[in-house]
Regions:
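Short, hydrophobic/aromatic-rich segments at coil-to-beta transitions
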Residues: 81-88, 116-124, 194-201, 233-238
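Gly/Pro-enriched, hydrophobic low-complexity segments
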Residues: 198-270
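Flexible, membrane-facing loop/turn or short amphipathic-helix motifs
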Residues: 93-102, 129-130, 208-217, 246
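N-terminal leader/targeting segments and the immediate start of mature chains
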Residues: 2-4, 8-118, 262-272
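Short, solvent-exposed aromatic-acidic interface loops
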Residues: 123-132, 151-152, 238-247, 269-272
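Extended lipid/amphipathic-ligand handling interfaces
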Residues: 71-77, 108-117, 136-141, 224-230, ...
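An acidic-aromatic
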Residues: 108-174
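Solvent-exposed helix/loop surface patches that form functional interfaces
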Residues: 159-195
Length: 272
C-alpha cells in the first residue's frame, strides 16, 4: 500500500480543520447536509484569501522592509493562540486519496474548527475518478460522523480511528513548530490579497509537514508559500506542492474568520 493509501477520511478531515490543512486538515464539511448552523459568523471579520476570489480589502498595510524572520516568529506566536478558524482547501494535480482503497480523491474542503476539538466540514471528492460528490463530516471530541454519499445520512465512525482536529493548532506539533522551524525564509514581497499581506517563502521540515497533513504527506521537506496579515500576524493563506508516487499535487489553503463563534453540534440524521 502506498503512503497516500494509508490515510482515511478521518485523517483528511483532521488535516483541514487544522488546515493544511487541513493542511488540511481535519481537515471541512456538513454545510450541504444541514448538519450545522453558522449564523454567528461575522463577514466583516474576513481575513482569509479564498482561492479563486478577490476578498474585500481590509486596508491592511505591510512594511516592505520588515525582517522575514521576525514576520514568521510573530506568526508562530499568533497561530499558537488561535481559538477558532474557518478554512478552505483546494487541491489540483495528482490525486490524493483519503481512503485505504484509493478510490476517493480529495478535490476541495471547506469548514470550521474550534478549540479544543470541534470541527465540521464539507469535502468535494471524486470517486473512482469519474463521479464527483460531496461528503460531510463532524468531529466533536473523540466522536466522528461521516455522511453516506448515497443516503446523505451520517454514520458514526467506529473506534480506533485517529482523529485529533486540535493537532493543527497544538503548540507542540501544529502551526507554531512549522513556522519556527522553517528554513531559508525570505520575504518575496507584499501582495494585495484583500489588503496587503506579507508573502513569505521557506522550506517546511518533513516532520511538521506530516503533522499538519495528518500523514497525507510523508518523508519530504516541502517548499511553502505563506501570506501573513501584517496587523494580526495570522496566516491567511498557504500554498505548497507535494510529490506523491512521483507525481505533483498542488495545495491552496485559505484561513479566515479567526476568533468567530461557530455552532458545531452532532448531526441529527445519524444512522448506525
Amino acid at each position: 500500500m502506498t503512503d497516500r493509501g494509508r490515510s482515511d477520511a478521518t485523517a483528511i478531515f483532521a488535516a483541514a480543520a487544522v488546515g493544511l490543512a487541513g493542511i488540511a486538515l481535519a481537515i471541512t464539511l456538513a454545510i450541504a447536509f444541514g448538519a450545522f448552523d453558522d449564523s454567528s459568523s461575522n463577514p466583516t471579520a474576513q481575513l482569509g484569501d479564498v482561492p479563486g476570489t478577490t476578498p474585500n480589502s481590509d486596508r491592511a498595510v505591510a512594511d516592505a522592509s520588515a525582517d522575514p524572520a521576525e514576520i514568521v516568529r510573530a506568526a508562530a506566536e499568533a497561530m499558537r493562540a488561535v481559538t477558532s478558524v474557518e478554512f478552505e482547501l483546494q487541491r489540483t494535480g495528482a490525486p490524493v486519496f483519503i481512503d485505504q482503497f484509493e478510490a476517493i480523491a480529495l478535490d476541495e474542503l471547506h469548514g470550521q474548527f474550534t478549540v479544543p476539538s470541534k470541527a465540521q466540514a464539507e469535502l468535494t471528492v471524486r470517486i473512482n475518478d469519474n463521479l464527483n460528490t460531496r461528503l460531510g463530516a463532524v468531529a466533536i471530541d473523540t466522536e466522528v460522523w461521516i455522511s453516506n454519499p448515497v443516503t446523505g445520512n451520517f454514520e458514526t465512525l467506529p473506534t480506533g480511528y485517529d482523529l485529533d482536529p486540535s493537532k493543527f493548532f497544538d503548540p507542540e506539533n501544529g502551526w507554531r513548530p512549522l513556522l519556527t522551524e522553517m528554513r531559508n525564509v525570505e520575504l518575496v514581497g507584499i501582495d494585495d490579497r484583500g489588503g496587503e499581506r506579507y508573502h513569505v517563502r521557506g522550506i517546511a521540515p518533513a516532520a511538521q509537514v506530516r503533522e499538519i497533513t495528518v500523514g497525507l504527506v510523508r518523508d519530504q521537506d516541502v517548499p511553502i508559500e505563506l501570506w501573513i496579515h501584517p496587523a494580526t500576524s495570522l496566516v491567511t493563506a498557504a500554498e505548497l506542492t507535494t510529490v506523491i508516487d512521483a507525481a505533483e499535487s498542488n495545495w491552496a489553503l485559505a484561513l479566515s474568520n479567526y476568533g468567530d463563534s461557530f455552532t458545531i453540534k452532532p448531526p441529527e440524521n445519524v444512522t448506525n
